[in-house]
């Protein structure tokens, strides 16, 4: 990654639902130096497996880095893809099953600018030296 992102572990373990990615070799113009970070915190339904989450992360990373245009357009494409994933999972549930829902924190560092999108209960703290 172009940016030095320190990842702090929670009780010595990776944070469940957190994912960070650097640009792929083939990406849309303007995405070369972008850093993508996602945090999905499931709020209801049976737990989504780590394998399913990883496949979602792989898919939306590809979508983000291949989407041309503004950073916010690429972020919107990621949010729409994740929402579609949740809808697909929920459509397969029985009537008695509790639907899946999740909070999302999505951040992109583009050059020296931080873009943040959030859905559901979440917060962002920006800390800097000085």
Residues covered by each model-derived region:
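PP2C/PPM-type serine/threonine phosphatase catalytic domain
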Residues: 1-130
């Amino acid at each position: 990654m172009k940016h030095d992102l320190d990842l702090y572990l929670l009780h010595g373990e990776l944070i469940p639902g957190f994912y960070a990615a650097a640009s792929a070799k083939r990406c849309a113009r303007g995405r070369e130096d972008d850093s993508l970070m996602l945090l999905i915190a499931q709020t209801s339904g049976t737990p989504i497996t780590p394998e399913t989450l990883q496949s979602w992360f792989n898919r939306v990373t590809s979508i983000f880095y291949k989407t041309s245009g503004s950073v916010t357009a690429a972020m919107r494409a990621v949010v729409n893809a994740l929402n579609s994933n949740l809808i697909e999972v929920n459509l397969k549930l029985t009537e008695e099953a509790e639907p899946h829902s999740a909070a999302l924190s999505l951040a992109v560092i583009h050059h020296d600018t931080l873009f943040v999108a959030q859905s559901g209960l979440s917060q962002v703290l920006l800390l800097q030296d000085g």
